[in-house]
Amino acid sequence: MPKTISVRVTTMDAELEFAIQPNTTGKQLFDQVVKTIGLREVWFFGLQYQDTKAFSTWLKLNKKVTAQDVRKESPLLFKFRAKFYPEDVSEELIQDITQRLFFLQVKEGILNDDIYCPPETAVLLASYAVQSKYGDFNKEVHKSGYLAGDKLLPQRVLEQHKLNKDQWEERIQVWHEEHRGMLREDAVLEYLKIAQDLEMYGVNYFSIKNKKGSELWLGVDALGLNIYEQNDRLTPKIGFPWSEIRNISFNDKKFVIKPIDKKAPDFVFYAPRLRINKRILALCMGNHELYMRRRKPDTIEVQQMKAQAREEKHQKQMERALLENEKKKRELAEKEKEKIEREKEELMEKLKQIEEQTKKAQQELEEQTRRALELEQERKRAQSEAEKLAKERQEAEEAKEALLQASRDQKKTQEQLASEMAELTARISQLEMARKKKESEAVEWQQKAQMVQEDLEKTRAELKTAMSTPHVAEPAENEHDEQDENGAEASAELRADAMAKDRSEEERTTEAEKNERVQKHLKALTSELANARDESKKTANDMIHAENMRLGRDKYKTLRQIRQGNTKQRIDEFESM
């Protein structure tokens, strides 16, 4: 039995190990990979490897793996990557896994600056990436620094703004919070809908020369071929939709494109190496085939996939709605519980206050009772003294009378009687004054006792009211394959039919233009970042983008502009560049 060969395939989010036979073809390995990851939209993808000359190459599906220019190492290393891009992600990408693989690959391209992305769009895209990873923002879970381990912005953007990590996190967090209620899968799709409007999205660039020898860029994408000046890969100058091309071929470094318009000359350019022309041919064939397929009714398989995807999405939405409903119920229950706890605490506090007031009133009552007793004792003492003085006065009166009688009876001498009379009169006067003073004091004490008695009655009434307040009970708790071409030339007929006249892509608008929410977010971010921007660190692409914005250009307006005029006019324009 022949010895097996170890193979390692790296997808955007996983690493797969396989053992293949020496006679295993590229298609057999590819089929094994897509089956393992559960991918059905296989037409976008391919297996990439570094050949013996360190060039990045796509594995040919119709040849044995071992017969290709793969480095002889163990295990053999391949990357599973998107080779072709859709025109419109929301219309064409059906499965969640397809959307996720595109999302991860596009995000990597943006973060590595392979796809130019302006700062404000980069921050908005970062917030969707965060929503797809973490779900809804939760301040209890997503504490300060929760994005510290994530690479979310291109290094260029970080260097162009005077903001530290915390300040960047704050800005991304604000937009993360804006996406509350959005499913992770929907966040992925929203990311791609904005990213596909970036000028460099989905474009394969090749360095070419025209007949004059001018160095230019050829851009191959889902919509056709575009020509760029050497110093500007954002703004194509001439465009040829796939519907205008009937044949593509190369002979060594010369590449020839024959237009459908028989009156138009051939579109000829030169690549620096034969292998580049082979790759251009393969990409043209694959993109053209997908372009034509999109303009025909969906196959039964695609219809079934779309129906299944709709059903799965509906199921997820139902589950999400159920979860949201349960979450709301739980939150309401928590709030009700908190409210009851709060009311309970308030009532307990009130009860405590009443108890303290009652205790204080009791103490005051006791104090007033004590004072009342003291005043009563004082009153009795004053009364007793007044009675004693009255008695003494009476006795003095009696003595006086007796003396008077004795003077009459005994005829004492006038001087003696006068002296005794004077003494007694003085004594009576003193006793009378003392009596009046004591009576005055008794009246004063009587008034004080009366006031204390009134305070006592009032306190008793307050205590009675406090004690009669009902006891508060504690509330109860609620709860294509690259054509295998060994030779230096190859040709491919690009079939066309009535559907080829469908150039609906020229009517498209950007997500920002048709989505008011995205437009508002981008304007707010542009304004917010302007104050922190270091103008001295602007790149050439930044300046080109700014100029395009000033002139009101976007990807689709430029597309319409560069396709104006007939094919001959555009080929002549290419030759004169």
Curated annotation (Swiss-Prot):
Sequence ranges of Basic and acidic residues compositional bias: 358-401, 492-518
Free-text description of this protein's post-translational modifications in UniProt: Phosphorylation on Thr-558 by STK10 negatively regulates lymphocyte migration and polarization. Phosphorylation on Thr-558 is crucial for the formation of microvilli-like structures. Phosphorylation by ROCK2 suppresses the head-to-tail association of the N-terminal and C-terminal halves resulting in an opened conformation which is capable of actin and membrane-binding. S-nitrosylation of Cys-117 is induced by interferon-gamma and oxidatively-modified low-densitity lipoprotein (LDL(ox)) implicating the iNOS-S100A8/9 transnitrosylase complex.
Sequence motif [IL]-x-C-x-x-[DE] motif, location on chain: 115-120
GO cellular component assignments: apical part of cell; apical plasma membrane; basolateral plasma membrane; cell surface; cytoskeleton; cytosol; filopodium; focal adhesion
Gene inactivation effect: Moesin-deficient mice exhibit no obvious abnormalities in appearance or fertility, but display altered humoral immune responses.
PROSITE patterns (alphabetical): FERM_1, FERM_2, FERM_3
Protein's job: Ezrin-radixin-moesin (ERM) family protein that connects the actin cytoskeleton to the plasma membrane and thereby regulates the structure and function of specific domains of the cell cortex. Tethers actin filaments by oscillating between a resting and an activated state providing transient interactions between moesin and the actin cytoskeleton. Once phosphorylated on its C-terminal threonine, moesin is activated leading to interaction with F-actin and cytoskeletal rearrangement.
UniProt modified residues of type N6-acetyllysine: K79, K139, K165
Statement: the UniProt record of this protein carries the keyword Acetylation: yes
Oligomer status and interactors: In resting T-cells, part of a PAG1-NHERF1-MSN complex which is disrupted upon TCR activation. Interacts with NHERF1. Interacts with PPP1R16B. Interacts with SELPLG and SYK; these interactions mediate the activation of SYK by SELPLG. Interacts with PDPN (via cytoplasmic domain); this interaction activates RHOA and promotes epithelial-mesenchymal transition. Interacts with SPN/CD43 cytoplasmic tail. Interacts with CD44. Interacts with ICAM2. Interacts with ICAM3 (via C-terminus). Interacts with PDZD8. Interacts with F-actin. Interacts with CD46. Interacts with PTPN6.
Membrane topology according to the record: Peripheral membrane protein
Protein name: Moesin
InterPro entries referenced in this protein's UniProt entry, alphabetically: Band_41_domain, ERM, ERM_C_dom, ERM_FERM_C, ERM_helical, Ez/rad/moesin-like, FERM/acyl-CoA-bd_prot_sf, FERM_2
Primary localization: membrane
CDD domains assigned to the protein according to its UniProt record, in alphabetical order: FERM_B-lobe, FERM_C_ERM, FERM_F1_ERM
Annotated spans, Disordered: 322-342, 358-419, 468-518
Phosphoserine, modified sites: S74, S407, S527
Transmembrane feature ranges: none
Organism: Mus musculus (Mouse)
Organism domain of life: Eukaryota
